[in-house]
């Protein structure tokens, strides 16, 4: 993809945890106001129902909309993908390290695995209903996740070793059925989130253990998808965006990934938590083999797709900006020079060009509280190791004033 498209080295997601990050991408709004601040759990509401998603918007233009994989924006009735603008959903509705919700309904044709039947599955649901200890439930139910089709469970426990392959298969099947009309596919594999699973043919494939194997499998399936689009004659009319929801879960050690040379990972407002890989490919529309270090944000995807679909952006309440001119001419167009760091629904820092200011006045910018004000020059210090707050006092004051302006 990078050889054929545009690689973004300063791409930011809206939050350093799953649900909040996904909410930012799908609404085009900062997490200060999109209603999702942290991580959702089974049997919970998620993205507020008054929020408009990319799928909601594109449906009004005649797009077929499909969601595949991890949803994590609410699993109660009214909050699942088919309630939020998607015509079809296939996947696990939250993180694959969680457990079945007691409100979920089983399809009459549900496939039960691992010695389960309907009675045993219903017992699991009653256990979840009685017990509110999340950690205990995860341990006792051993990550038994439900696989959904639209609003019903069609497999329990889900065979997680085959989910990546099946998600991509279903996405390609959906595209094939809808190739004569515009389509929007939101494809979010459960991997490489822990617990890690891979298909048998990918076990031991990498030199990076199970985590590397999971990444290899995703990579291979992305290749399958791109080949499918080419074979179907859709490559020139389909933009493909590849990214991640947040940085690596460092507490999981070798199974959690790494963001080096960036600092920290998931849960953190340092670069390793919110700066993720991103590649955009669109045959004959985006220059091939380009790399850009311009600041881009996931909230920019919504307004960009609206403009490409020739829709009126002014009808939507968005924080993102359009990237249409930038992606066709990345060398000469600078879309934005500023990014706001948001954690737990609050603005906790700002980047302006090469400077990053994190006041950290007791807020949880990192997994541990840090009361020290910090100023970094990210171009010279990509690992955020050298705090220049006391040395560059004029720049610190400038950034502090800028942050105050953005916070009001």
PLM feature segments, named:
Residues 1-374, 378, 382-408:
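Formylglycine-dependent sulfatase
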């Amino acid at each position: 993809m990078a050889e054929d498209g545009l690689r973004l080295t300063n791409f930011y997601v809206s939050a350093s945890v799953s649900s909040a990050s996904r909410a930012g991408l799908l609404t085009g709004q900062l997490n200060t106001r999109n209603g999702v601040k942290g991580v959702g759990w089974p049997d919970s509401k998620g993205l507020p129902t008054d929020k408009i998603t990319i799928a909601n918007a594109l449906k009004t233009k005649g797009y077929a909309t499909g969601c595949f994989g991890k949803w994590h924006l609410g699993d109660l009735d009214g909050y699942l993908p088919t309630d939020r603008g998607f015509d079809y959903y296939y996947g696990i509705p939250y993180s694959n390290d969680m457990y079945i919700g007691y409100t979920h309904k089983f399809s009459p044709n549900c496939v039960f695995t691992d010695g389960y039947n309907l009675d045993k599955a219903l017992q699991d649901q009653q256990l979840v209903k009685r017990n509110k200890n999340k950690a205990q439930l995860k341990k006792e139910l051993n990550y038994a996740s439900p696989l959904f089709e639209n609003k019903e469970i069609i497999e329990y426990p889900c065979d997680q070793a085959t989910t990546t392959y099946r998600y991509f298969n279903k996405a390609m099947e959906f595209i094939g059925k809808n190739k004569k009309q515009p389509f929007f596919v939101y494809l979010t594999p459960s991997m490489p989130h822990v617990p890690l699973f891979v298909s048998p043919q990918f076990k031991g494939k990498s030199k990076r253990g199970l985590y590397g194997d999971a990444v290899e499998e995703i990579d291979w399936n992305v290749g399958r998808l791109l080949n499918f689009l080419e074979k179907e004659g859709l490559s020139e009319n389909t933009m493909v965006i590849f990214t991640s929801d947040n940085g690596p879960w460092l507490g999981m050690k070798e199974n959690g990934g790494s963001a080096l040379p960036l600092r920290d990972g998931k849960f953190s407002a340092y670069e390793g938590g919110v700066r993720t890989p991103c590649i955009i490919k669109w045959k004959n529309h985006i220059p091939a083999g380009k790399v850009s270090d311009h600041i881009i944000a996931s909230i920019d995807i919504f307004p960009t797709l609206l403009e490409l679909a020739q829709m009126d952006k002014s009808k939507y309440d968005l924080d993102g900006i359009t990237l249409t001119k930038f992606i066709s001419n990345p060398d000469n167009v600078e879309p934005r020079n500023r990014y706001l760091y948001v954690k737990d629904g609050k603005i906790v820092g700002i980047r302006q060009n090469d400077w990053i200011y994190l006041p950290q006045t007791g807020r949880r910018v990192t997994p541990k509280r840090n009361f020290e004000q910090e100023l970094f020059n990210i171009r010279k210090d990509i690992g955020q190791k050298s705090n220049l707050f006391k040395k560059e006092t004029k720049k610190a004051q400038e950034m502090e004033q800028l942050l105050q302006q953005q916070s009001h």
